[in-house]
């Protein structure tokens, strides 16, 4: 049977998509890359002097883009975008008197290259990037799914995928998702920051490969397992759940940790547990700083680690 050869694609052309959403499209034309576009934190405004009302071009400000997305709009960017694109997109940030939870937001389309840290801590929304363009690593808490716009790659939040969008989106190989067990397996070897950011359900994210900054940041439930090494701030501001690194981590593991468990089957770096409040860190090695202290394991600790498949010398940092 040859019918599949002539099967019509369900993908729309970009013009069709834009025309269907013409009342919601905001177009931004860039002459050069600009950092922090569609960044819901405005370059971590609580620790920077960033002004959201800064004009990017033609009366469009950084705040214009964020508010347009919050209202379910479409942002169409023509040109290369800079670093931290779509940072914390879809988060109702507490700093701005929000709930800290996910909010539904709109869509971003890019005809251009994308610089590093695209989608760090991203929690909702959809980003389409022209397949002719490049995306620099590390990326953020995003994963590619099957696109419905011809000629464009489609990215969504890893956290949102495992919590709900797995029902409607199709992962691209070699990544896999087991719907029955709630386990996402990331095999694409793309280096990412903030994997599993703000995870709030009992789902599991497994990364087969190295990760970079802030794995599991602000998690409350679930599990992130990295079969590789991790960068700085692993488990930062962890508020529950479990982060397991089957390798080494860089410095500041468990920074400002509030709850939950971190297991490092290797060296957890320097400044371990800096500004930590609650929670437990297990590691084979690492240099803690006050208020965190280093302890030998008790029988319950040994039994817990054994239940995860670990034996040999570990320390507990609390």
From Swiss-Prot:
Pfam short name (any one): GXGXG
GO molecular function terms attached to this record: oxidoreductase activity
InterPro entries: Glu_synth_asu_C, Glu_synth_asu_C_sf
Family: To M.thermoautotrophicum MTH238.
Protein name: Uncharacterized protein MJ0658
Biological source species: Methanocaldococcus jannaschii (strain ATCC 43067 / DSM 2661 / JAL-1 / JCM 10045 / NBRC 100440) (Methanococcus jannaschii)
Taxonomic lineage: Archaea, Methanobacteriati, Methanobacteriota, Methanomada group, Methanococci
């Amino acid at each position: 049977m040859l019918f599949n050869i002539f099967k019509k694609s369900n993908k729309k052309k970009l013009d069709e998509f834009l025309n269907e959403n013409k009342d919601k499209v905001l177009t931004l034309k860039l002459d050069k890359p600009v950092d922090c576009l569609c960044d819901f934190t405005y370059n971590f405004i609580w620790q920077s002097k960033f002004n959201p009302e800064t004009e990017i071009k033609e009366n469009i400000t950084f705040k214009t883009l964020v508010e347009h997305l919050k209202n379910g709009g479409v942002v169409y960017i023509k040109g290369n975008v800079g670093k931290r694109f779509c940072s914390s997109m879809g988060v109702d940030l507490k700093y701005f008197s929000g709930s800290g939870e996910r909010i539904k937001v709109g869509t971003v389309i890019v005809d251009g290259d994308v610089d590093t840290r695209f989608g760090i801590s991203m929690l909702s929304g959809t980003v389409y990037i022209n397949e002719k363009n490049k995306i620099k690593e590390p990326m953020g808490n995003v994963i590619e799914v099957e696109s419905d716009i011809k000629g464009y790659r489609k990215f969504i939040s890893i956290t949102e995928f495992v919590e709900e969008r797995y029902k409607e989106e199709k992962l691209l190989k070699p990544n896999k998702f087991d719907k029955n067990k709630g386990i996402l397996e990331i095999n694409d070897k793309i280096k990412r920051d903030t994997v599993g950011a703000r995870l709030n359900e009992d789902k599991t994210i497994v990364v087969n490969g190295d990760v970079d900054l802030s794995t599991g940041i602000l998690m409350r439930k679930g599990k992130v397992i990295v079969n590789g090494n991790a960068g700085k701030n692993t488990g930062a501001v962890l508020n529950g759940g479990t982060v397991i690194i089957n390798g080494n981590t860089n410095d500041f593991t468990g920074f400002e940790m509030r709850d939950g468990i971190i297991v490092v089957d290797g060296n957890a770096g320097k400044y371990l547990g800096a500004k930590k409040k609650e929670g437990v860190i297990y590691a084979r090695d690492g240099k803690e700083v006050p208020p965190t202290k280093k302890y030998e394991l008790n029988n319950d600790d040994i039994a817990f680690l054994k239940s995860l498949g670990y034996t040999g010398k570990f320390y507990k940092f609390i």
